[in-house]
Amino acid sequence: MKSGVARLGYLGHTVADMAAIDTIFGDVLGMQRREVAGSQEVMYRMDGRHHRFVFSPAKSDQLSFIGWEVDSLQALRAVVERLKNSGKEVTKASPDLCLLRSVFEMYRCTGPDGVPLEIYFGGVDD
């Protein structure tokens, strides 16, 4: 059984011009826009997954997190163990954050460039 990251799951960005995001991702690329209840965040999907992109309004454009998917809980725990053994601080995501990202279980750490990495299992297809 594979015990590493299987695929890129989603990307999170802060953006200064949310209208431009709607134009590019919705009108030009034809992705489906999804609202986030109680938030200014907007998600876009391009396939069967709940979302692949998360955009939050901000004063500047910046990559804000990267979601990496694994194929099993066993693989998730193996990745987390390897990260911890390499000296990375890894924290388990709250149930609320897992619900927001539409994943079953997730852990977070910071990548070498300072961007938060989210390693998860159980992305929602809908």
Predicted regions and their residues:
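Vicinal oxygen chelate
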Residues: 1, 7-16, 58-126
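Generic structural signal for beta-strand residues in well-ordered domains
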Residues: 1-4, 46, 59, 100
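Core segments of cupin and vicinal oxygen chelate
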Residues: 3-51
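Conserved short beta-strand elements that form part of the metal-binding/catalytic scaffold
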Residues: 31-64, 109, 115-123
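Glycine-rich loops and low-complexity Gly/Arg-rich segments
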Residues: 38-39, 68-70, 78-82, 92-93, ...
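Non-heme Fe(II)-dependent double-stranded beta-helix
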Residues: 47-50, 69-70, 96, 101
